[in-house]
């Protein structure tokens, strides 16, 4: 299995390391044609407006959207969640609109307000340590979206078909279970 990690901007190296620990071949994707070489893609945390702008500049935006809409598996964390969402409610910006969620940017506070907490995730036998850094909050979601985890009444891990999104940063932990879940979606 070969998985792509978007290398446009953000903490893509940490996702690459996590996936390699799971024995997966990883390609850092920076060009549209590289999407054809991978079976799924991770979009990391970072700065969502910068990511969108660069994706459009290098013609990755439209190709990625087209692939996702035809069933290509994708996993977005933090800024990646914002990129994949249907709508950003507190900031005017483009998004790919491939998962039926509305998000609020930086809803859990600024960088200094970052925190870790244990959360329950559907299908996991024990709690998961989630790390939130300037995290987006899901304020609404469609009927076809499955909520896999909640923190303080807000969904933090969601799935719609082959799109998985997380408000938190699973790549910053030693726990591989969220990445394993994504890989199970790709198989």
Swiss-Prot record:
Keywords (alphabetical) are: Glutamine amidotransferase, Hydrolase, Lyase, Pyridoxal phosphate
Q: Which GO terms describe its cellular component?
A: cytosol; glutaminase complex
Q: Does the UniProt entry include the keyword Lyase?
A: yes
Q: Which GO terms describe its molecular function?
A: glutaminase activity; pyridoxal 5'-phosphate synthase (glutamine hydrolysing) activity
GO biological process terms, alphabetically, are: glutamine catabolic process; pyridoxal phosphate biosynthetic process; pyridoxine metabolic process
Catalyses: aldehydo-D-ribose 5-phosphate + D-glyceraldehyde 3-phosphate + L-glutamine = pyridoxal 5'-phosphate + L-glutamate + phosphate + 3 H2O + H(+); L-glutamine + H2O = L-glutamate + NH4(+)
Q: Which CDD domains match?
A: GATase1_PB
Top-level taxon in the UniProt lineage: Bacteria
Binding positions for L-glutamine per the UniProt entry: 46-48, 105, 133-134
Q: How does it assemble?
A: In the presence of PdxS, forms a dodecamer of heterodimers. Only shows activity in the heterodimer.
Q: What does this protein do?
A: Catalyzes the hydrolysis of glutamine to glutamate and ammonia as part of the biosynthesis of pyridoxal 5'-phosphate. The resulting ammonia molecule is channeled to the active site of PdxS.
Q: Member of which family? A: Belongs to the glutaminase PdxT/SNO family.
Q: Per its record, how is this protein called by name?
A: Pyridoxal 5'-phosphate synthase subunit PdxT
Instruction: Write the lineage as a comma-separated list.
Output: Bacteria, Thermotogati, Thermotogota, Thermotogae, Thermotogales
């Amino acid at each position: 299995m070969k998985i792509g990690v978007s290398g446009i901007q953000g903490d893509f190296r940490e996702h690459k390391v996590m996936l390699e620990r799971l024995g997966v071949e990883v390609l850092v994707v920076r060009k549209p044609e590289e999407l054809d070489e991978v079976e799924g893609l991770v979009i990391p945390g970072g700065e969502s407006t910068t990511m969108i702008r660069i994706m459009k500049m290098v013609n990755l935006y439209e190709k990625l959207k087209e692939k996702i809409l035809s069933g290509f598996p994708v996993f977005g964390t933090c800024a990646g969640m914002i990129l994949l969402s249907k709508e950003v409610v507190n900031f005017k910006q483009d998004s790919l609109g491939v998962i039926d969620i509305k998000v609020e940017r930086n809803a859990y506070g600024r960088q200094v307000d970052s925190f870790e907490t244990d959360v329950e995730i559907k299908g996991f036998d024990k709690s998961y340590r989630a790390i939130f850094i300037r995290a987006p909050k899901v304020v609404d979601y469609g009927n076809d979206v499955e909520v896999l985890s909640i923190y303080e009444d807000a969904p933090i891990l969601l799935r719609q078909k082959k799109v998985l999104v997380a408000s938190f940063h699973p790549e910053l932990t030693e726990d591989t279970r969220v990445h394993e879940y994504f890989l199970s979606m790709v198989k």
